[in-house]
A protein has these predicted regions:
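Metal-dependent phosphodiesterase/phospholipase catalytic core, i.e.
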Residues: 1-108, 129-134, 138-140
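C-terminal active-site rim and adjoining tail of enzyme catalytic domains
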Residues: 31, 103-104, 110-186
Length: 186
């Protein structure tokens, strides 16, 4: 994930040391990027969390291991998700007690988990078996979708992101089981 979306700085967040991240500000605020452990301490189990692990690479382990160390001591309800199906599979092997979700979006050539090297989640239902998914995270702009509907028919909940307007809320209510909101209170 690029730093420019939330901080205006350039670079990939996974390549910047935590001490440097602490010096960056989120948007126009005086808030810095919190570490996962800081977020977990702040939330302290008061609300359920879905932790999105952002690892765009084929090789897994570094990001996932760091997150699992922080999550090991967390007593609150949480799940993990990723666009990277290898990350989700890593979590199935190493964090089997946590619910897992595969995030998907619609790219020009159809449904894909992020990355050119990944195959279509909706055309290859095998992802469900290799990662034992408990939910699918789906971009609202990709709905309605026959592929998303097939997952729901198989009992896998569909959580849509990111709803910012009342018309998108109506679309999400018609095609999904739960919703991520941003800058919008329904």
């Amino acid at each position: 994930e690029s730093l420019d979306r939330m901080t205006g700085a350039r670079g990939e967040i996974s390549r910047v040391p935590a001490v440097e991240l602490a010096g960056l500000r989120l948007g126009e605020s005086d808030q810095s990027i919190p570490l996962l452990r800081e977020v977990l301490d702040l939330i302290d189990g008061r609300v359920p969390l879905i932790i999105e692990l952002k690892n765009p690479r084929r090789r897994t382990g570094r990001v996932e291991t760091a997150a699992s160390k922080d999550l090991a001591g967390y007593g609150g309800p949480c799940a993990v998700s990723s666009f990277n199906r290898r990350t989700v599979a890593w979590c199935a092997r190493n964090l089997p007690h946590l619910p897992r979700g595969q995030n998907v979006m619609k790219f020009r050539r159809g449904w894909f988990a992020a990355g050119q090297w990944q195959s279509s989640v909706f055309r290859e239902f095998q992802t469900r078996h290799s990662t034992r998914l408990q939910f699918i995270g789906c971009h609202i702009g990709a709905l309605p979708s026959p592929g998303a509907q097939r997952f729901r028919e198989r009992g896998i909940p569909l959580i849509v992101f990111t709803v910012r307007t009342p018309d998108r809320l109506a679309l999400a209510n018609a095609h999904a089981d739960n919703i991520f909101f941003e800058g919008f209170i329904p």
